[in-house]
Curated annotation (Swiss-Prot):
Transmembrane segments: none annotated. The gene is rbcL. It is found in: Plastid, Chloroplast. The basic functional RuBisCO is composed of a large chain homodimer in a 'head-to-tail' conformation. In form I RuBisCO this homodimer is arranged in a barrel-like tetramer with the small subunits forming a tetrameric 'cap' on each end of the 'barrel'. Pfam families: RuBisCO_large (PF00016), RuBisCO_large_N (PF02788). This is Ribulose bisphosphate carboxylase large chain. Belongs to the RuBisCO large chain family. Type I subfamily. Its main location: plastid. It comes from Blechnopsis orientalis (Fish fern). The record marks K311 as: Transition state stabilizer. It catalyses: 2 (2R)-3-phosphoglycerate + 2 H(+) = D-ribulose 1,5-bisphosphate + CO2 + H2O; D-ribulose 1,5-bisphosphate + O2 = 2-phosphoglycolate + (2R)-3-phosphoglycerate + 2 H(+). Substrate binds at N100, T150, K154, R272, H304, S356. GO terms for molecular function: magnesium ion binding; monooxygenase activity; ribulose-bisphosphate carboxylase activity. The lineage of its organism: Eukaryota, Viridiplantae, Streptophyta, Embryophyta, Tracheophyta.
Length: 414
């Protein structure tokens, strides 16, 4: 399984693993073990190996390089033949590549840093239900980032008071408000009541401002059937967008919801709840850029992507690297930004990155510079924490955004 002379094919799925072998285990042996366990291998030779062509189907560790400044840590590059994976299934992709190998005895730690998804495979996925340009056309909003707000307190409000907070924020000038990721259907606020009061707030704020407004109605539920029932009700109410927690809900549920949203004209906002369990450790788990690529294939029009300047962790260059992987068609390899492979998405629509977490109006100049126009800037406490209330907080955000955009556009002539 360690084949340094292997020439990768355009159709191979390529993976970059950061691996820390156990003391005494050679890097080549560890790399071969990763390639074997994540493809056709097992712990011993079996007689049924002779009934198939392992050369055709096995993963190959084709390169290993030491990590600068780290003792006994290596980047192992593995190539997988396309036929190992079911078309259009992120679930199967991850089950194969990361499903079992992370508990391997020969390794102290293992982290999947990046994947190269070839067009031959990415074209089998639904991708974002609509994409950036279609969303702008639906909302009739151009030339600036979109503004959002997560309603706080995240838990405990009644449906009517929740709807009131939504109305005040949208009336003040925001484009979107949002259910928190853990707002589903709890005893203090059942989902149907919340949807009804939020719909009333949407229509009232639209009538008063003349702008199209949205609220991310969280359709995440305990079963796929219940999730789709909530999405259907949101569409019947005339809501433009629903939301899903894609890691806790699962990729199968997420792709099912993405198909429904595309077929029924709903935008799909994605929250990454639970991501830090997977991506926080620097030497074990999976980098968020891999989860971001998986989401773009599984389906979503927005996804939370860190802020660089807020309360949550995020390095500027690395964050901008996976923001480009979400938005752009073609992204060149750039190790300084953590991009291990050139990625060609061909015609797959882009995903709007959402900056959210501990940001407020004083961050607006930095946010508009870092994320550009094709983004959603989402302020929770940065809106609702305004000393004069929710609506003035929304006004402050909108004024700050428009001032920054005007300063950028007109520069010294302002």
């Amino acid at each position: 399984y360690y084949t340094p002379d292997y020439k990768t094919k355009d159709t191979d799925i390529l993976a970059a693993f950061r691996m820390t072998p156990q003391p005494g285990v050679p890097a080549e042996e560890a790399g071969a073990a990763v390639a074997a366990e994540s493809s056709t291998g097992t712990w011993t030779t079996v007689w049924t190996d002779g009934l198939t062509s392992l050369d055709r189907y096995k993963g190959r560790c084709y390169d290993i390089e030491p990590v600068a400044g780290e003792e006994n840590q290596y980047i192992a590059y593995v190539a997988y033949p396309l036929d190992l994976f079911e078309e259009g299934s992120v679930t199967n992709l991850f089950t194969s590549i990361v499903g079992n190998v992370f508990g391997f005895k020969a390794l102290r730690a293992l982290r999947l840093e990046d994947l190269r998804i070839p067009p031959a495979y990415s074209k089998t996925f639904i991708g974002p239900p609509h994409g950036i340009q279609v969303e702008r056309d639906k909302l009739n909003k151009y030339g600036r980032p979109l503004l959002g707000c997560t309603i706080k307190p995240k838990l405990g409000l009644s449906a009517k008071n929740y709807g009131r907070a939504v109305y005040e924020c949208l009336r003040g000038g925001l484009d979107f408000t949002k259910d928190d990721e853990n707002v589903n259907s709890q005893p203090f606020m059942r989902w149907r009541d919340r949807f009804l009061f939020v719909a009333e707030a949407l229509f009232k704020s639209q009538a008063e401002t003349g702008e199209i407004k949205g609220h991310y109605l969280n359709a995440t539920a305990g079963t796929c059937e219940e999730m789709l029932k909530r999405a259907v009700f949101a569409r019947e109410l005339g809501a433009p967008i629903v939301m899903h927690d894609y890691l806790t809900g699962g990729f199968t549920a997420n792709t099912s919801l993405a198909f429904y949203c595309r077929d029924n004209g709903l935008l799909l906002h994605i929250h990454r709840a639970m991501h830090a369990v997977i991506d926080r450790q620097r030497n074990h788990g999976m980098h968020f850029r891999v989860l971001a690529k998986a989401l773009r294939m599984s389906g979503g029009d927005h996804i939370h992507a860190g802020t660089v300047v807020g309360k949550l962790e995020g390095e500027r260059e690395v964050t901008l690297g996976f923001v480009d992987l979400l938005r752009d068609d073609y992204i060149e390899k750039d190790r300084c930004r953590g991009i291990y492979f050139t990625q060609d998405w061909v015609s797959m629509p882009g995903v709007l990155p959402v900056a959210s977490g501990g940001i407020h109006v004083w961050h607006m100049p930095a946010l508009t510079e870092i994320f550009g126009d094709d983004s959603v800037l989402q302020f929770g406490g940065g809106t609702l924490g305004h000393p004069w209330g929710n609506a003035p907080g929304a006004v402050a955000n909108r004024v700050a955004l428009e001032a920054c955009v005007q300063a950028r556009n007109e520069g010294p002539n302002l």
